[in-house]
Amino acid sequence: MTGCLTWIHFGDLHVDEADGYEGLSRFRALIASAEAHLGSAVDFALLPGDNANHSTDDQYARIADAMKGLSLPWHVLAGDHDFEPSDLTAMRAITAKMAPYAETIAGYRCLFLDIVSAGKGGPDFRIDPDQRAWIERELSTAAVAGEPVAVFMHAYPGDLRDDPDGIAGLFAAHRVAFVDTGHTHYNELLNDGRVIYGATRSTGQIEEGAPGFSIVTLDDGVPSWRFQAVNDPWPLVQITSPADRRLITDPARADNVPGSAFTVRAKVFGAADTVSLHVDDGQAIPMKRVDGVPSLWSASVDGIADGLHHLVVRCDGSEDRIDILVRNAGPRPKRNPPIALGRDVNAIGAWLERGIDGAQRGPNKNGLDW
C-alpha cells in the first residue's frame, strides 16, 4: 500500500484592485478556515495559476502576505494571467520554485507543469519539447520506482494548443492517479476512462456558488475530491477508499470494484471522537483510527452482495456519501477504449454533494471578458 497524499486547492485567485481585491479577501478567509481545521491532515497547499489578475508587483505582494497565514508547504503554478507581461518574473514573489519541477511527497511523485511560458500569452497553452521529454522521463522513472503519480497544471490537456492528445496519452499510459487543474472557474471532475481530472471553483471572479477550496486525497492511488465552501460546517468527512463509481478507472482493482469483503477508509478533517460507517443506510459500524496516518479512519465489511451500494461515513453531524459497485463471482465491468483523453467531454456531470452543479459556468466556456 502506497499510503495517503492529501492537498488543499485554492482556486484561481484573480487578485485585482479593480474589484476591490475581492479575490484576496476571500483567500484570506479561506486560509483562516484551513489553518483552524486541517492541521497535519494535509500535506501541502496548491495555487493552480491566475494568481494575480494582471501580474503586478503589488498584486503579488498582497498574495504573498496572505499566504503567510497558512502553515503548510505551498506549490504555485502560473496561469495565463500571470504570464500577462510575457514572463513570470513578478510571480517569483510568491514562490521560490518555478515549474516544471517534481517532488516525491508521501510516496507519490508529484509533477508541477508550466503550460504558459511556451505560448504567446492568453490561453495559448503549450508544452515545449524539452518539458515534454522531461515529463516522459519523470513518468518512466516513477513507474520503475513504483511511485504513483499526481500531475498539476493550469488547464486540462485538452486545452493545449499543441499535441493535447499526446500529453493526455502519456498520462493514461502511465496510469497517472490524478491531474489537478485550475482555469475553468468552476468545480468539475473528468473521468476519461484512464485518468481522473479535477478543476476547482475560482476564488475571484466566481459565477457559481460561494468561495471555497477543494481537498483531494489519493489513498493507495484511489482519488477522492471534496469541495468545502467558506461557511460549510466542520468536521469535513471524505471517504477515500474504495472509489466512488463515478471515479472508477480500473475495474480490475479491488479498491475500484470491490468484492463482498472490503475495507472502507475515510479522512475526517477537524475534531473527531466517534466515526461510523453505514452500508445502504444500515446500522452503524464503528470506525477506528489508522495508526501513522493523520485523520484517517477505517472499518471492514463482509457479505456485501453484487450490485450498487451506498456508503455513508458520519462524524459529529457531518457525513460523506459515495456509491460503489460490488462484484463477487460475476464478470467485472469492462473498460471501454478511451475517447478524447484529457478533454472535458468526459466530465462526470453534476454531483451536488461535491459542490459540482455540472453547468460549467465560467468565462472560458461562455466568452466573458475576464
Where would I find each of the regions flagged by the language model?
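Active-site glycine-centered loops adjacent to acidic/histidine catalytic or metal-binding residues
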Residues: 12, 49-50, 79-80, 154, ...
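Short acidic, glycine-rich surface-loop motifs adjacent to enzyme active sites
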Residues: 48, 139-159
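Extended active-site neighborhood of metal-dependent phosphoesterases/phosphodiesterases
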Residues: 56-145, 163-178, 184, 188-226
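Aromatic sugar-binding surface patches on proteins
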Residues: 72, 290-300
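Binuclear metal-dependent phosphoesterase catalytic core
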Residues: 195-281, 296-328, 332-335
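Serine/threonine-biased, Pro/acidic-interspersed low-complexity stretches characteristic
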Residues: 220-224, 316-370
